[in-house]
Amino acid sequence: MRTVFSQIPRFKQVNQYIRMSTRQSDISNFFISSASHKSEHVEVSQSSSDSKNVDGRSTSEKRKVESVKLVDESKHNNHDDTGTQNVERENNIVSEAKKQKTLGSSSSSSDAVSSNNDSGASTPIPLPIKEPPLESNARNDKLKGHATFAEMVKAFTKIENTSKRLEIIDIMGTYFFGILRDHPSDLLACVYLSINKLGPDYSGLELGIGESIIMKAIGESTGQTLQQIKLSFHKVGDLGLVAQTSRQNQPTMFKPAALTIPFLFDSLKKIAQMSGNQSQNRKIGVIKRLLSSCEGAEPKYLIRALEGKLRLQLAEKTILVALANATAQYHADKNGEKLSQQDRIEGEQILRDVYCQLPSYDLIVPHLIEHGLGTLRETCKLTPGIPTKPMLAKPTKQISEVLNTFDQAAFTCEYKYDGERAQVHFTEDGKFYVFSRNSENMSVRYPDISVSVSKWKKPDARSFILDCEAVGWDRDENKILPFQKLATRKRKDVKIGDIKVRACLFAFDILYLNGQPLLETPLNERRKLLYSMFQPSTGDFTFAKHSDQKSIESIEEFLEESVKDSCEGLMVKMLEGPDSHYEPSKRSRHWLKVKKDYLSGVGDSLDLIVIGAYYGKGKRTSVYGAFLLGCYDPDTETVQSICKLGTGFSEEHLETFYNQLKDIVISKKKDFYAHSDVPAHQPDVWFEPKYLWEVLAADLSLSPVYKAAIGYVQEDKGISLRFPRFIRIREDKSWEDATTSEQVSEFYRSQVAYSQKEKEGSPAAEDY
């Protein structure tokens, strides 16, 4: 053993040893990551003065393990035929390290490339399952000069040090411009990594990695026990920081090859696609190999990406603006043109509009690289098979507001059905899709809808996109079922023969027909097309019931009728002219929703995230008795507490929720949860953000305890719900689709304005 360590100075001299701290920042001088799945650096303890390691083993014991690790890594690396200088350096060490093989210790599983070593005694940490090589090509990577993760991390670090949105846009715009100029083929992966996604929402690609897997990977990669990692996490509350600190404290002989963007992105996608036997061990293996190539702040952002939260103020709308600015500047420079501020503003609007219609960077980014923003609207249009973002409605507290909003314009009232928003697509080649409001592909969940298409689609409808509500239907009595019945349907692997609750489509809009987008067609014309191309089929498909009303009395009557017909209330929409156009992703005042239950309350229900719970008392001692809920601020990527909820539950509800939530309990509050730090205000347990509940409240009030929309109305106070009541679980939405902080502030302002109007007997100000 002494022989190995006595030779380290000579290895440094002969092999031109380069310290990690001198790593070059110029992207063109970075090493590109290896083609194979193995790490290109060797870990050796460089300190002979330490008497004990952090995991309690003696220095000599640690050196024995690391010596054999060094042998196995070098032996594995001999299979690399790239002939790079790094491999030659490692081969020089192999001959010395092999002399120590007789120690009898087997390689620890913390070795990022030791999975091929089948010999040796067992170690305290089990060896991972052999991992197939990740597909990459080191030689091609080096020739192409791919972008590195280090450059992205530099941009992220700058963003973490500012809260100014314009600065954040400028930082990301500059970063994207550099990628366009130097590595255009990497732009798509860079965009996805910046928004922490692996593909379009409808692709269904999600990492789905829990804290336990990440902790285990960090521990095995850095030579620490799981208990040590848990202890560090409990202290700092950020696994990214734990990984960064652990990696920095890990001695290394050589700097690792730079982690390239394509290699990282492909690795994350492979993790997302892993399933079946031993998939957990395989995921850990990939994470370890990625960590072994990280330096500086890279481990922090890698781990945060795996967790699904970068914790930067990088909302997707910010990325869109930055990407538009970078694209406009790149093509202006390329064509020798000067870019004006007006050009930038127009470019931002073009990209926003196109992305709302066609939310797929897979299709948009290649066009941006090749042609810029000028022809984007003509090329990237609404397309069957790719879900567009749905148009949303504003809530209203009183029917008179409807008449005030629409004034003398023509409008229509439609039933608001109590079901699941469904965007139905039919392509020219006969493919059928059903997408949820958050672009999830629900086709496999609704095979009964798919097989009924021929009953309600007329032959002339060759391709189309419909906006509908999927509603539970009682086929025996031919009537609507409550949403709770529809929610009992399985979400995956649904077979028609096993379906107990059938779904019926209630269509209320058509967005695309036979090759033509209809978004800029007035609603009255879209409705005519809808009625001419489709026909009702009892229990399978029908049209949303509508009535064109003109007075408060007639609207009230239609509202009462909708409630009797098992609906939630009414949707009131502009019927003619440009204001009746369909606006994807926009919550517009040209659509208003009127719900019977909410006319005297907040004006709408809220969809809130379950983030904590309080143990029950009395009859509820065996379950959670109340819950801490929060709204979501997409700009700051924070979940902000809004209320403690303890009413509206049945005993069956509480039992079900306890069994669901106990599996996602976490040891401490997430660092992106905003809630009072006062001990008396803390819940008994905290949860991972996963479940979304619909909640109704009497009204809203300012609060020093709850942090919802803090800073929107008052700098030091948030907004809370008074007398909240549980309505239902929102299985059709992800937790990131929760009611936003901005919406909460709008509800509060509307409430204050309405109160002032009643008190003073004067019209409320438009902008309170």
Swiss-Prot record:
ATP binds at E414, R421, R437, K573, R587, K593. It is found in: Nucleus. Its EC number is 6.5.1.1. Mg(2+) 2 binds at E568. Pfam families: DNA_ligase_A_C (PF04679), DNA_ligase_A_M (PF01068), DNA_ligase_A_N (PF04675). Residues 104-124 have a biased composition (Low complexity). Residues 42-139 are annotated as: Disordered. Mg(2+) 1 binds at E469. It catalyses: ATP + (deoxyribonucleotide)n-3'-hydroxyl + 5'-phospho-(deoxyribonucleotide)m = (deoxyribonucleotide)n+m + AMP + diphosphate. The keyword Calcium does not apply. GO terms for cellular component: mitochondrion; nuclear replication fork; nucleus. PROSITE patterns: DNA_LIGASE_A1, DNA_LIGASE_A2, DNA_LIGASE_A3. The keyword Chaperone does not apply. One of its GO terms (molecular function) is DNA binding. GO terms for biological process: base-excision repair; cell division; DNA biosynthetic process; DNA recombination; DNA repair; lagging strand elongation; mitochondrial DNA metabolic process; nucleotide-excision repair. Keywords: ATP-binding, Cell cycle, Cell division, DNA damage, DNA recombination, DNA repair, DNA replication, Ligase, Magnesium, Metal-binding, Nucleotide-binding, Nucleus. DNA ligase that seals nicks in double-stranded DNA during DNA replication, DNA recombination and DNA repair. Belongs to the ATP-dependent DNA ligase family. PANTHER family: DNA LIGASE 1 (PTHR45674:SF4), DNA LIGASE 1/3 FAMILY MEMBER (PTHR45674). This is DNA ligase 1. It comes from Schizosaccharomyces pombe (strain 972 / ATCC 24843).
